[in-house]
């Protein structure tokens, strides 16, 4: 989990990858917006939508320099304590910018905003607006309210805080998403109803609410018409999707995947974040039937110990997880698997950890988001006694991360001589004769080709391993352009 400056869609900067940047302009009459995004891909998606929204409503243009911005927005994450403290650390830096420019508008959104509410303005009174993940669509109105209050005496000003949970209303008010590049995120549901003992998501984003099926399909079809070829479906518990159909029925997540696969132009499907409980037989069969489904799965498990899973209230066992992955790999032997791991959960014994470590090796994960447990106020786990020292936790985490990194290296090395289906995304910054794309397993693939091929899929034979995430190859076959 990282903190990153918001940049337009397509935006994973890498050694051989070029990205679309916000337009820079010297015209001081143009209002400029800076968004800092913390945390998950849901937040990244929300930041895109904030930019679309304020661009349409107030004409704001994105900038990568907070010093030249007229409005600063921070889209926050509260999963871990350190991430939460980074919010106030960054706000301290933004305070200096506001001292230099009193007209600067500062807004805080996301999960920390939802959790802290007006406490943010008590701790940082120079913050003008606080809004939650479900109320970002009200930003234009909040901005207008702020402008209306500028001339009022301080005693007459009201705090602009909106952290309510108006179901799925926000999607009805967001503009059509802008397209930059050939990949796009599409949020299909919000919130989570699992109430794992360590997690704040149900309290900061609310319980699970699915977008109507027709809305999701219409958004994806619109993106495909604009050249998007890879869709990543998003949700805190994305495979628990149950969207209402036009006829009043319910569409499950596997049914949604099958419908999306029929949309012309969509050549690749990903999703995150999923839960083992809803990783159903029907979902596994989608990997058998739908070539658009990538051979890469992120399925958070959190621990490889049944005792720890029970304390986490995950409501499944390790055997259930292993059985589902075995079925999936029988269909897709080349499946790359990643997961989330919480190390040092309260009560985790040395035996519990060793069970997790062995589990990681047995399932051969090649990527993970692994962290030391972070106590979150208001969660059941925050009341549990924690007797493990920080030194032991750090040692355990290092052991897990080292093994997974070595596994990732082995899997990248094993790509030598294989044929990979690659989405060609851009021309290399370093060499105009080279094209850059991504394989199913997220590795960057570089090869010699015509810039006119950008946006198409190709079969590439891997000829050289450059780094952990970068390989070189040669073109074997260029798929027809579906545009």
Curated annotation (Swiss-Prot):
This is tRNA-2-methylthio-N(6)-dimethylallyladenosine synthase. Keywords: 4Fe-4S, Cytoplasm, Iron, Iron-sulfur, Metal-binding, S-adenosyl-L-methionine, Transferase, tRNA processing. Belongs to the methylthiotransferase family. MiaB subfamily. Residues 31-148 form the MTTase N-terminal domain. One of its GO terms (cellular component) is cytosol. It comes from the Bacteria. GO terms for molecular function: 4 iron, 4 sulfur cluster binding; metal ion binding; N6-isopentenyladenosine methylthiotransferase activity. Residues 413-477 form the TRAM domain. [4Fe-4S] cluster 1 binds at residues 40, 77, 111. Monomer. It holds the Pfam family Radical_SAM. Binds 2 [4Fe-4S] clusters. One cluster is coordinated with 3 cysteines and an exchangeable S-adenosyl-L-methionine. Catalyzes the methylthiolation of N6-(dimethylallyl)adenosine (i(6)A), leading to the formation of 2-methylthio-N6-(dimethylallyl)adenosine (ms(2)i(6)A) at position 37 in tRNAs that read codons beginning with uridine. The gene is miaB. It is an enzyme of class 2 (transferase). Its EC number is 2.8.4.3. Residues 178-410 form the Radical SAM core domain. Its main location: cytoplasm. It catalyses: N(6)-dimethylallyladenosine(37) in tRNA + (sulfur carrier)-SH + AH2 + 2 S-adenosyl-L-methionine = 2-methylsulfanyl-N(6)-dimethylallyladenosine(37) in tRNA + (sulfur carrier)-H + 5'-deoxyadenosine + L-methionine + A + S-adenosyl-L-homocysteine + 2 H(+). It is found in: Cytoplasm. Its cofactor is [4Fe-4S] cluster. The keyword Metal-binding applies. [4Fe-4S] cluster 2 binds at residues 192, 196, 199. It comes from Acinetobacter baylyi (strain ATCC 33305 / BD413 / ADP1).
């Amino acid at each position: 989990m990282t903190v990153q400056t918001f940049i337009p869609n397509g935006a994973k900067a890498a050694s051989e990858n070029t990205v679309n940047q916000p337009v820079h302009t010297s015209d001081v009459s143009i209002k400029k917006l800076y968004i800092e995004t913390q945390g998950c891909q849901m937040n990244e998606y929300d930041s895109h939508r904030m930019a679309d929204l304020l661009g349409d409503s107030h004409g704001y243009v994105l900038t990568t320099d907070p010093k030249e911005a007229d409005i600063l927005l921070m889209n926050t994450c509260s999963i871990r304590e350190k991430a939460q403290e980074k919010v106030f650390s960054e706000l301290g830096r933004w305070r200096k910018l506001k001292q230099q420019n009193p007209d600067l508008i500062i807004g805080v959104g996301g999960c920390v905003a939802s959790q802290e509410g007006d406490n943010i303005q008590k701790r940082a009174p120079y913050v003008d607006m606080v809004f939650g993940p479900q109320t970002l669509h009200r930003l234009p109105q909040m901005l207008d309210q702020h402008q209306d209050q500028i001339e009022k005496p301080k005693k007459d000003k009201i705090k602009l805080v909106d952290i309510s949970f108006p179901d799925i209303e926000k999607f009805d008010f967001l503009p059509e998403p802008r397209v930059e590049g050939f990949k796009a995120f599409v949020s299909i549901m919000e919130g989570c109803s699992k109430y794992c003992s360590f997690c704040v998501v149900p309290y900061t984003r609310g319980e699970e609410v699915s977008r109507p099926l027709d809305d999701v399909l219409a958004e994806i079809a619109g993106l495909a018409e604009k050249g998007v070829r890879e869709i990543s479906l998003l949700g805190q518990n994305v495979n628990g999707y149950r969207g209402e159909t036009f006829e009043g029925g319910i569409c499950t997540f596997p049914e949604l995947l099958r419908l999306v696969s029929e949309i012309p132009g969509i050549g690749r499907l990903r999703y995150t974040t999923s839960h083992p409980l809803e990783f159903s037989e029907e979902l596994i069969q989608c990997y058998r039937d739908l070539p658009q489904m990538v051979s890469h799965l992120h399925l958070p498990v959190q621990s490889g110990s049944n005792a720890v899973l029970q304390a986490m209230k995950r409501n499944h066992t390790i055997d259930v997880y292993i059985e589902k992955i075995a079925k999936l790999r029988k269909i897709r032997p080349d499946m790359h698997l990643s997961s989330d791991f919480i190390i040092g959960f309260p009560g985790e014994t040395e035996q519990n950890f060793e069970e997790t470590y062995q589990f990681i090796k047995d399932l051969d994960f090649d990527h993970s988001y692994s962290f030391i447990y972070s106590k979150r106020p208001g969660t059941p786990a925050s009341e549990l006694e924690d007797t493990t020292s920080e030194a032991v936790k750090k040692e355990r985490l290092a052991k897990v991360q080292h093994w997974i990194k070595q596994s990732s290296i082995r899997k990248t090395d094993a790509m030598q001589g294989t044929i990979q289906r690659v989405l060609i995304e851009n021309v290399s910054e370093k060499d105009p004769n080279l094209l850059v794309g991504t394989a199913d397993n997220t590795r960057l693939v570089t090869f010699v080709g015509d810039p006119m091929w950008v946006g198409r899929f190709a079969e590439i034979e891997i000829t050289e391993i450059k780094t952990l995430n970068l390989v070189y190859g040669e073109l074997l076959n260029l798929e027809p352009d579906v545009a």
